[in-house]
Amino acid sequence: MTPKAKESNKLQWWWTERVLARAVYLKQRWLSADRCYVTCPGNEDGLGAQLQARLSGMLYAHCQGLTYVHSPMTSLHFTPANEPDWPAKWERFLGLGAGELAARDVAHDLGEPRRVNSPTEIQQMIRDSFWSLPNCHAYAELYPHRYLRLSQRFAERYHAAPKDGCISHYTPGAVNVAVHLRRGSDLTHKMHLMSRSDDAAALLQTIVDALHDVGGRSVIRVFSQGAEEDFRELRQFGVEFHLNEDLFSTFHSLVLADVLVIAKSSFSYAAALLSRGLIIYKPMHHAPLPNWLTSGADASLDRSSLVRRLRAYLDSRPAQGALP
């Protein structure tokens, strides 16, 4: 393909995905009707992807004046062999379906939903219509700032759900930094999503310097898979390693952190959407929220901006930090 043809394809993609999609969403919002239902059962994915699918569905329904109905997770990739009720445990733990209509109840009244692949395919916003999408990422990528309208609701539901037996790694009185590094067998064919230790070290150096400027006690924890030897570049920062640990504990610790460094992963991206802390984002396939700090592709991060945001966060956080 010639450079000119590539540029033409790029412009065509931009026009279709950005301009036309915005026009479709504007028309949908204008025509939206009471009792037009939307659900996002997700695909056959892992926890992070399925959780993020539902969060994007809640966002789309809320902003477009539709009614979100909840489809609980029934199957998750990487479910332990001895945990047949693993998806149900996560539903109870996350609590996102609390207060929402159940998809099965709406289907009982209206019949099975009409399935489409993208929210732009929903053309009839009429009363008593029922739509099912794998996710609403296409909408969320255009309007990531609108997640801020729901962040309080997400956090309240999550923290109201029972966390029985879940060990959280959080030190009261300190600045708790959680760093998620993506490793594991799921990356065999997705090596571009793996977190590099040298990038993490560069980012941690900036974080450590900023914490020194702010003053006070801090604890840095690294959550990942593998062995400590795989992360030897990070030992110089005195981090606590939490490797191959219980997934509930890991996720909860990410959500609770005062500072959360997310990986190129729906798992930590979804945790960030539930978090009340300061989020440090590295460019990936899902867009950041406007109140997140974005590092460069080379893991660079503006130290002065981080110091400023840390001080503002610490001045306003409750005594228990990001805890509810």
Task: Identify the meaning behind each predicted range.
Residues P3-Y37, L76-G216, Y313-P324:
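Secretory-pathway luminal glycosyltransferase catalytic domains
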Residues N43-Q52, T188, M194:
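A short, glycine/small-residue-rich beta-strand->loop->alpha-helix junction that serves as a flexible
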Residues A49, H70, L76-A81, D186-H189, ...:
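Short catalytic/ligand-binding loop motif for oxyanion handling, primarily in non-cytosolic enzymes
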Residues L211-P283, L289, L293-S295:
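Donor-binding and catalytic core of enzymes assembling or modifying cell-surface/extracellular glycoconjugates
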Residues L293-P324:
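Acidic, PIN/NYN-like endoribonuclease modules and their adjacent C-terminal/linker elements
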